[in-house]
Amino acid sequence: MLATEKKQELIDQYKRHEGDTGSPEVQIALLSERITYLTEHFRTHKKDHHSRRGLLKIVGQRRRLLDYLKSNDVERYRAIIKSLGIRR
């Protein structure tokens, strides 16, 4: 799981205004961090299929948020893709 400090750091980096925790950029950044953490987890725990299902759910959620952002504001979409280094 994400440490509180790391989570707050990501929120501060991607927030759109003060007190923002729910904008698509923040949500995508937090989900990307969890995906990275789980990917590392699976390198050592190859048979953890139960958690792998959760990873696929998180990846799908991030994809839906990215699709939403792409359809509403392409510039913000391109900025978040570039800053997180997501292949799309």
From Swiss-Prot:
Stretches for region Disordered: 1-21
Keyword vocabulary terms for this entry: Ribonucleoprotein, Ribosomal protein, RNA-binding, rRNA-binding
Recorded superkingdom: Bacteria
One Pfam family this sequence matches: Ribosomal_S15
Molecular-function annotations in GO: rRNA binding; structural constituent of ribosome
NCBIfam families: S15_bact
Protein family membership: Belongs to the universal ribosomal protein uS15 family.
InterPro entries, alphabetized: Ribosomal_uS15 (IPR000589), Ribosomal_uS15_bac-type (IPR005290), uS15_NS1_RNA-bd_sf (IPR009068)
Compositionally biased residues, Basic and acidic residues: 1-20
Subunit (UniProt): Part of the 30S ribosomal subunit. Forms a bridge to the 50S subunit in the 70S ribosome, contacting the 23S rRNA.
Name of the protein this chain belongs to: Small ribosomal subunit protein uS15
Gene3D superfamilies: 6.10.250.3130, S15/NS1, RNA-binding
Species: Syntrophotalea carbinolica (strain DSM 2380 / NBRC 103641 / GraBd1) (Pelobacter carbinolicus)
An individual GO BP term: translation
GO cellular component: cytosolic small ribosomal subunit
Protein function: One of the primary rRNA binding proteins, it binds directly to 16S rRNA where it helps nucleate assembly of the platform of the 30S subunit by binding and bridging several RNA helices of the 16S rRNA. Forms an intersubunit bridge (bridge B4) with the 23S rRNA of the 50S subunit in the ribosome.
